[in-house]
Amino acid sequence: MKVLVYRKCSTCIKALKWLDEHNISYEERAIKEENPTYEELKEWYTKSGLPLKKFFNTGGMIYKEMGLKDKLKDMSEDEQLKLLATDGMLVKRPLVIGDDFVLTGFKDKEWIEAMHV
């Protein structure tokens, strides 16, 4: 299982602690230094079944500075995925990629269900 995190994000730290407490092994990846590629994002988005907007860090500074709240609705899915691939800070975190699930953000109820804890 891969977990993409930003170490200065308190939610990410909380999520990693949760995984450790539940003895769930994972491979940590720094989302800012090694942002997801277009190909990865497209695969994860398809696998997730989630709306693409769930992959955006809507509370982030870059999202707000770029005015994406108003721009996304006029962009194709392909354009949105390419945009997400330009900067890991645009991506909702933590982003968890399991064998049969993809999770955005940390909601322990969703994590318990997905990871069968």
Language-model segments: which ranges?
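Thiol/selenol-based redox catalytic cores and closely related redox-interacting motifs
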Residues: 33-117
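Local sequence-structure signature of Cys/Sec-based thiol-disulfide redox active-site neighborhoods
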Residues: 1-22, 26-31
